[in-house]
Amino acid sequence: MERLRYLYEQAVDGKKKFVYYCSGCDCVLELRASSFDAHLPASSCVNRSCPLDAPGPISPPRPETLFQRASSIPHFTLGFPPLDSLLRPLSERQLVVFSGDYVSTVAELAALRAQLPVESGGLDSAVVFIDGGNRSDPYLFSSFARQLGIRPHVAMRRVASCRAFTLYQLAELVSERLARTAEDYGARLVVISDVLGTFNEPELDEREVRRVLGAVYEGIEELKERSLIIATLPSRNKYDGLVVPWADISIALSHSRDRVRAERLGRSGLAPDVVTFKPNLLLKAARVGVRR
């Protein structure tokens, strides 16, 4: 009986180890210094009650195990309850647009959280990060990694970063290269930071902007077939109204006095639509159990 293979890497005594889990009972099968063929049978499970090692036919699952509450199914989270309450349900094949203050912080947090195991609210995945406005912050990313006990240089190796200097470079990256790059890296999360960061030239013709953004939109729609996409709009731009409607989920953040106000736009009948929190808590969001 085959079991679940390599799930993630962890450092043990300063050395990288590959962790393998049993698909029957979630027990750790073993740690290895290197990976091995995922199609080969795994070692016997140490759990004597593991259903995969039971003799004879395996009993069919009970009816209650065939259906699960949505809240019990692992899904990607930012690990920051105030924002996670607005994002549910969050899954792949979605575009989430964050606009306003602190959205670059959210982008760095998401790029780190996506690398965590699924059981910890991550995607167990590499990340593709397109920087459209020179907004990436490796120091903040490293801070989030340290909060989770992850070596920053190890986490950074799982982020494929690319800087776009013109709107045409951004359009080419997203429409022609992004889907292939995400597939090559196995990235289940793609971050497009400051989508409109290069759309700030005063002589730009609006028809040309619409044409270029149309190419960006088509690239995002293609990518949504396999990945979750987070896009940010950190500063106001007259073309925001062309991008926000693309979103499956749109979150607007604004800073007033000592609080950040986050609102999910375009949603009614599902609470909460608005939350507030202290900005310093977001900088510590990688830590478990952050309170509002």
Enumerate the predicted regions with their spans:
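Short linker/helix segments within small regulatory modules
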Residues: D13-G14, S34-S43
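Short cysteine-rich clusters marking metal-coordination/redox-active sites
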Residues: C22, C45
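The Walker A/P-loop phosphate-binding site
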Residues: A54-R146
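Conserved inter-motif catalytic segment of the P-loop NTP-binding fold
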Residues: V128-E201
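P-loop NTPase motor core
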Residues: A179-W246
